[in-house]
Amino acid sequence: MNKLITIERHFLEQQKSHPEATGELTDLLNDVAFAAKLVRREVVRAGLADILGMAGTTNVQGEEVKKLDLFANEKIINAIGEHGRFALMGSEENEGTIIPPNNDTGRYILLFDPLDGSSNIDVNVSVGTIFSIYRLTGDDPKEADINDCLQKGSEQVAAGYVIYGSSVMMVYTTGQGVHGFTYDPTIGEFLLSHENITTPERGKYYSINEGSLHQFNDSTVNFINYLKEDDEATGRPYSTRYIGSLVADFHRNLMTGGVFVYPATKGHPNGKLRLMYEANPLAFICEQAGGRATNGKERILDINPTELHQRTPLYIGSKEDVLKAEEFEKEG
């Protein structure tokens, strides 16, 4: 683009188009962008800074924690929490909610996955940060509790992700379209590079771990087989593209068209991805870009959460592809 627009300037211009805006959400998003810069700085030099490998602990999910997971989690909590703009925070790495300092004026809730796909970081595969912002449901920030976090995804006021790859991009929505910013390390700024992102109605790729095919139910297997069949009218067969890093797989399909599938399995009948930290924010972005997201039977953004670390199956991507997946799930 000829006109260089920083992410801060973009947020301000968006704010001006809403006379009722107080500027609080603009400040929150700027805080998130700043935290992303801190995480990016360490991700790109992880092999030199002795923060690769395992930390020797497990998180609330029962998963081994990487050193970089802990670093990213700590940086985001410290960079964002100290400004007093959030009444409460929740991280995939923390069992309970996080009460930020100076939260007595916070009017928002932040939920985030500090480093999605971190199991790939040791082999230099793209990883990402995912975030979701809600309004406080009550009037007193000091009385904020877990119930303020357990809102439907349709109540999100903003969501986004940062992908740390060959370049670093931040993609976000506030319900007014989806915009992407690429980090320019020479000036230390995120610059608008992808305005009003839309995803194709039908894609040509599917992303799923077919190594777990024996764990899938028949309807999921039938859907995958359908995508592999020859049919010129619907652009089949589809090609497989699976990285194993949710942000990277989702981002590629968002830009090129396709469907990401992480279904229920025999080992995880309720799914494995986290509703609040992964599925909800990506579903908000996907729908704003013209796509669709479901658990196979219900729209992701309509699910009533009952737990902070609740899991869900996920079918997300191009609208026609997800609708077809739902057809197979309903038949099954």
UniProtKB/Swiss-Prot annotation:
CDD domains on file: FBPase (cd00354)
EC number: 3.1.3.11
Species per Swiss-Prot/TrEMBL record: Prosthecochloris aestuarii (strain DSM 271 / SK 413)
Name of the featured protein: Fructose-1,6-bisphosphatase class 1
Cofactor: Mg(2+)
Protein family (similarity comment): Belongs to the FBPase class 1 family.
A GO biological-process term: sucrose biosynthetic process
Chain sites annotated for binding substrate: D116, G117, S118, S119, N209, Y242, K272
Biochemical pathway: Carbohydrate biosynthesis; Calvin cycle
Localization annotation: Cytoplasm
UniProt-annotated binding residues for Mg(2+) 2: D113, D116, E278
Cofactor detail note: Binds 2 magnesium ions per subunit.
Catalytic activity: beta-D-fructose 1,6-bisphosphate + H2O = beta-D-fructose 6-phosphate + phosphate
GO CC entries: cytosol
Positions with a binding annotation for Mg(2+) 1: E92, D113, L115
GO molecular function, one term: magnesium ion binding
Taxonomic lineage of the native organism: Bacteria, Pseudomonadati, Chlorobiota, Chlorobiia, Chlorobiales
Classification via SUPFAM superfamilies: Carbohydrate phosphatase (SSF56655)
Subunit: Homotetramer.
HAMAP family tied to this protein: FBPase_class1 (MF_01855)
Keywords: Calvin cycle, Carbohydrate metabolism, Cytoplasm, Hydrolase, Magnesium, Metal-binding
InterPro entries (UniProt xref): FBPase_C_dom, FBPase_class-1, FBPase_N, FBPtase
